[in-house]
Curated annotation (Swiss-Prot):
Subcellular location: Cell membrane; Secreted
GO biological process, one term: negative regulation of activation of membrane attack complex
A Pfam family that the UniProt record links to this protein: CD59
Signal peptide: 1-25
Function: Potent inhibitor of the complement membrane attack complex (MAC) action, which protects self-cells from damage during complement activation. Acts by binding to the beta-haipins of C8 (C8A and C8B) components of the assembling MAC, forming an intermolecular beta-sheet that prevents incorporation of the multiple copies of C9 required for complete formation of the osmolytic pore.
Protein name as annotated: CD59 glycoprotein
Record has Membrane as a keyword: yes
Annotated glycan sites: 43
Ranges where the UPAR/Ly6 domain occurs: 26-108
Matching PANTHER family: CD59 GLYCOPROTEIN
Maturation-removed propeptide residues: 103-128
PROSITE patterns listed in its UniProt record: LY6_UPAR
Amino acid sequence: MGIQGGSVLFGLLLVLAVFCHSGNSLQCYSCPYPTTQCTMTTNCTSNLDSCLIAKAGSRVYYRCWKFEDCTFSRVSNQLSENELKYYCCKKNLCNFNEALKNGGTTLSKKTVLLLVIPFLVAAWSLHP
């Protein structure tokens, strides 16, 4: 591999490192009991990599959550709620009450890696 190929590979690895850098812990709104407006914040532990807001009737839950477990069955089971609307996100204090209006979930780091890896392979194979 020539110098140019090494530079391209180094640049791509640097981009991956930026995507995967964990930095400081995620900060979420987190209240021990359902409430309509949670103002308490917490720094999530490393295994809880997203913030959750879930609404079941008039009860609104705010927690740190494992993004991998952000599915209806896991959320409803953990909160003991049969019907709810939920939202998981990966930015500081993103689980505020208005977040439920946006709906859906954000991309996980694994998904980003799965999208980036084919580009790395293609860049590597294109270099003579």
